Amino acid sequence: MIELSDAHRARVDAAIDRALARLTARCAPHGDGAQALAAAVSASAADGKRLRPALVVASFTAFGGDTAATPALWDVAAAFEILHTALLVHDDLIDRDVERRGILNVAGRFRERAHAYGADDRGTATVADAAAVLAGDLLLFEATRLVATAALTDDERDQLFAVLDEAILVSAVGELADAEHAARADLPDAHALLTAAHDKTAVYSFRAPLRAGAVLAGATSHAALSDAAAALGLAFQLVDDLIGTFGSRRQAGRDPGADLREAKRTPLIALARQTDAWPRVSDALAVAHTGPIAVRRAQREIEASGARVGLEELVHDNLRRARAHASSAELPPQAVVLLAALADAIERRIP
């Protein structure tokens, strides 16, 4: 995708570290539980690809911003990484996951902690859920605080709060829709699943950080940028769905076909349902949780249904839309180059 330079990564990481150190210091007087929560929060924000801060910085420079003259850039970029971490913590809670990237997440850490002091299964689950809710809440506030205290003009701050407000609200709407789709007795249609995929990820991961960078650089018109970024964000999420079904262990960061084993209701599955091959796909999905052989069978049936090609075409449609919006006369040449490069990078991720 897109990466921060070593120097820029160091500036973003320093801003994140300052925010987490502040949280740790504030939790310290409040006892062992608060200290454990601060440690879990810090661990959840460690490492990562820093995609969203990279988009903030790339957009800022593409719209003519001077990184040396804008110290607020690093706090705002860090805010989007902390927002991302908050949403991941809450997403793991909703999905009942206790690990992320093979490492115990906030809930997982507090499950172990509760077991250690003798909690029963119900108490352990309650403590783990509470810790994940509270950790995500603290991170959401910290992301907002970074923008509130950054060295910005009043107008910049107002615009950035509007961007952040939309990102958090739309992500919450998408997360709820995703949870309700998973709970329904019937499989939602492809449009509903596409809308949830867009809302859950595209706004906070692409549109918001790209707009934030443009605001910091003094851009006055964001319509074409917003439209291109929304299309890029949806394409990115759809490629993630393809990776979750067909990607390698290296691409997915977990066992191949994990989405099939976990019976996730993705746009890919909704497209398969619209085909005559659905009975065979459905039968294969019903046993995909049993092991690698069953996963491979489900992969073959989905591919034979044409759903994989159909989803790839949706990815390409959104990338074409993004490139069309990027060609708008209102965008500076470097912003056009940036959006085109992002579209190319997303295309290369297709498994």
Regions found by a protein language model. Give the residues of each.
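Well-ordered alpha-helical scaffold segments within catalytic/enzyme domains
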Residues: 58-64, 143-150, 208-216, 271-276, ...
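All-alpha helical catalytic cores of prenyl diphosphate-utilizing isoprenoid enzymes
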Residues: 29, 45-51, 130-141, 148-246
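Short hairpin/turn module used for nucleic-acid contact or packing/dimerization
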Residues: 297-351
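Conserved N-terminal diphosphate/IPP-binding helix and adjacent helical/loop segment
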Residues: 1-80, 85, 89-125, 175-191, ...
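Divalent-cation-assisted or electrostatically stabilized phosphate/pyrophosphate-binding catalytic cores
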Residues: 100-136, 186-203, 249-276, 286-313
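Residue-level signal for inorganic ion chemistry
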Residues: 55, 143, 269, 322, ...
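Active-site alpha-helical segments that house and flank conserved acidic catalytic motifs
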Residues: 73-101, 165-172, 203, 211-214, ...
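Hydrophobic packing residues in well-ordered alpha-helices of helical domains and bundles
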Residues: 5, 9-12, 73-79, 136, ...
